[in-house]
Regions:
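Low-complexity, intrinsically disordered or signal/transmembrane-proximal segments
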Residues: 8-11
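Low-complexity, highly charged intrinsically disordered N-terminal segments
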Residues: 58-110
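Gly/Ser/Thr/Ala-enriched C-terminal appendages of enzymes
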Residues: 17, 26-80, 228-230, 235-236, ...
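Buried, small/hydrophobic-residue-enriched core segments of structured protein domains
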Residues: 17, 25-61, 65-68, 117-126, ...
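Glycine-rich, N-terminal phosphate-binding loop and its surrounding beta-alpha-beta segment
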Residues: 89-147
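Extreme N-terminal basic, low-complexity initiation segments
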Residues: 3-4
């Protein structure tokens, strides 16, 4: 079969193996992306041959490397992995598939080990996972998760799960940590310039990131991480993830909003009609957003919104969020606020700052960063405007501009148990890069004078260990609600 025919029939043109997709007739192909055995790095398939022969268990932990007194890490997302991934059982079909892939891939395969998991454990991975409460804030260098195998025949399993487990922790935790920085900046601005900052804060940052990430699943995980701190989102998969994995009936809200295609479809000569249609269609909903720079943002705000539709907007009883989507990211939104003030008026709040008539507000979401946001907020304040006039939106800045090194996430082995039951410290300490040194010995986390602190488990001395069992041998031991996560993150 030639290369084009291989691809046409669902085969990988390099390995010749069938891949997971659906054939032209709609039937599923053979490869199973949900195969837990293959949810790892390739080289880990060889690790069952590499440990000391007397090994019975390996303990490993996840942390953000480095030391700091700054509390800047939000732990979130492990429960998504536990419910969506680790709750699946391995089958003999998975074992056969993994063996085929490993051999074709140039690696040994532990068929006996995986067959043992199927027969002795019903296919569920014999692991115990301990973790901090989800949503908790901590410093770098504090263990977030600790995992160990519960079956001495599966000493290699702790390392095998590293790829999937670390990925499941670093991404949502990094997104939640970054979004918290935005929340702190917005809170500061609102506390200075708004009368009810805590009431306003949850809706001040919208998530527009769904289209800018690599997969629907990533949008859901990152979108849920954003919702830990805010309630406004257009990443529907984030709402679904919070609903499915944390029991949140509705973790986020959206509102009707236009895009350029729905506005430019009317043509430039009917731009005012396009805006008027938005008012007539959506004013009863209470709030809606209209992108207004398809042609000329200044003309749209000053003339169409500010003159032609001014009385209609004021009489509608709703709030129109005007969204500029181009121009200088700092100057343009501030100018729009000033133009709306000139046309619709503003009142002074108790702190002495101007608040636009309730019928109009501004959304700025054109590729802004946290630094941009701070500049916009500072300029608004300098001109005497409250931060409540502006709602921000971020897309890739929330969900995509992040990687494992953003907070230096790592998972490392810290202890090995031998067949007599004795634990031995395991650690790494590279002579040329001390920052990559790992912790030795099984870990615990306690509350200290400066926040959470890592201590050895054998030095706990009666103190409460905040690393608590959340999963064991296929069973969820702690089911965090989204309300609990949000309360921790406040």
């Amino acid at each position: 079969m030639n290369v084009s025919r291989l691809a046409q029939h669902g085969y990988d043109i390099v390995t010749g193996l069938r891949i997971t997709c659906r054939a032209m007739d709609g039937r599923p192909n053979d490869m199973n992306w949900a195969n837990l055995i293959l949810n790892t790095d390739s080289y880990k398939l060889s690790h069952f041959l590499q440990y000391p022969p007397e090994t019975a268990a390996i303990s490993s932990y996840i942390e953000t490397r480095g030391g700091s007194d700054l509390i800047d890490v939000v732990f979130f997302g492990l429960q998504i992995f536990l419910k969506d991934v680790l709750s699946r059982s391995v089958t003999m079909s998975d074992v056969a598939e993994a063996e085929e892939v490993a051999q074709a891939h140039g690696l040994p395969f532990d068929r006996a080990g995986w067959t043992h998991i199927v027969n002795a454990h019903g296919g569920y991975l014999p692991l115990r996972i301990e973790a901090l409460p989800e949503g908790i804030l901590t410093r770098r260098g504090v263990p977030l998760v600790q995992v160990v195998n519960t079956d001495p025949a599966c000493w290699w399993l702790t390392s095998h799960i590293e790829t999937a487990l670390l990925r499941a922790v670093w991404y949502p935790s990094s997104v939640a940590s970054n979004v918290r920085k935005v929340k702190l900046a917005l809170r500061d601005a609102l506390e200075r310039t708004a009368d009810e900052p805590e009431l306003l804060l949850p809706s001040r940052l919208l998530d527009y990131g769904a289209r800018g990430v690599g997969a629907f699943e990533q949008a859901g995980i990152g979108g849920a991480a954003h919702l830990v701190h805010f309630t406004g989102t257009d990443t529907l998969s984030g709402v679904l993830t919070a609903r499915r994995c944390y029991g949140a009936a509705m973790a986020g809200r959206s509102m009707p909003a236009s895009e350029h295609s729905t506005m430019t479809a009317w043509g430039g000569d009917r731009e005012a009609d396009a805006y008027a249609n938005m008012v007539s269609r959506f004013a009863p909903s209470g709030a809606f957003a209209v992108v207004s720079d398809s042609y000329d943002i200044n003309q749209a705000v000053s003339f169409i919104w500010g003159k032609q539709l001014r009385d209609t907007v004021k009489a509608a009883g709703a709030t129109v969020y005007i969204r500029p989507d181009s121009g200088d990211p700092i100057e343009t939104p501030v100018q729009v606020v000033q133009q709306l003030d000139y046309r619709f008026g503003a009142a002074q709040n108790r702190k002495g700052f101007k608040v636009l008539d309730r019928c109009v507000r501004v959304i700025q979401g054109d590729g802004i960063t946290l630094a941009d946001m701070n500049q916009i907020l500072n300029r608004l304040e300098a001109f005497g405007y409250s931060a409540e006039n502006m709602t921000f939106a971020m897309g890739g800045g929330i969900l995509q501009k992040v990687n494992r090194d953003t907070y230096a996430f790592a998972m490392k082995a810290n202890a090995r148990q031998d067949t007599s039951g004795r634990w031995h410290d395991v650690w790494k300490r590279p002579a040329t890069m001390n920052v990559k040194a790992s912790k030795a010995g099984r870990q615990a986390v306690v509350s200290g004078m400066a926040g959470l602190e890592a201590v050895r488990l054998d030095a706990l001395a009666g103190r409460e260990n905040l690393l608590r069992p959340v999963w064991q041998d296929g069973r969820l031991l702690k089911d965090w609600s989204f309300e609990e996560v949000r309360a921790q993150a406040r």
